[in-house]
Amino acid sequence: IPRYIDNGIEDRIWSYWGGNIKKGNDGKYHLFVCGWLESSTKGHMEWPNSYVFNAVSDNLTGPFVARNMIGKGHNPEVFQLKDGRYVLYVIDGRYVTDNINGNWEYGKFDFNARDRRIIEGLSNLSFAQREDGSYIMVCRGGGSWISYDGLSEYNQITDKRVYPSVEGRFEDPVIWRDHIQYHMIVNDWLGRIAFYLRSKDGIKWVTDPGEAYMPG
């Protein structure tokens, strides 16, 4: 059976990784995805030289076509501020724009650990807007941080990881909030599984029984 190529994004030049979809005011779906040259002899290890693209589709599942290259970066995650601007996180930086189809300005977040140990560094960040309009962020190590408006300084509010209390090598958390609660899925590369967690406030998390997904 041939592979279904209309789901997501296909390209003979770029090898894509990750991806975050946001519906724009133009009614189209925008996939923010990073990629490196398919021709690279390093293969996946070329990821430090990734670029971030804005790919567009009329459908949520694609096919997406890369419209423009935003700049260098890896592991993109996009979110929208209360004032309508878009923030595109990448490892060790972020881009900001007034127009999802416009030009993006590069900058960096400010972090204040507040005399707490930073858990496994600040990479692979994931964000969710809180009920009061502030933003919570969970970093790769499982520490929680809060910013007043999503761009202002992020302050660490935990001194231990929020992940399940089991031995594991956790990374790539993804958090979001719906009208009821906060949700998180996090990978454990040691156990080769992923866990699903829930929270009422985005700070104290409960791990649901079972696994979000596992090999096979």
Question: What residue spans do the PLM features occupy?
Answer:
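Carbohydrate-active catalytic/glycan-binding domains of CAZyme proteins
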Residues: 1-216
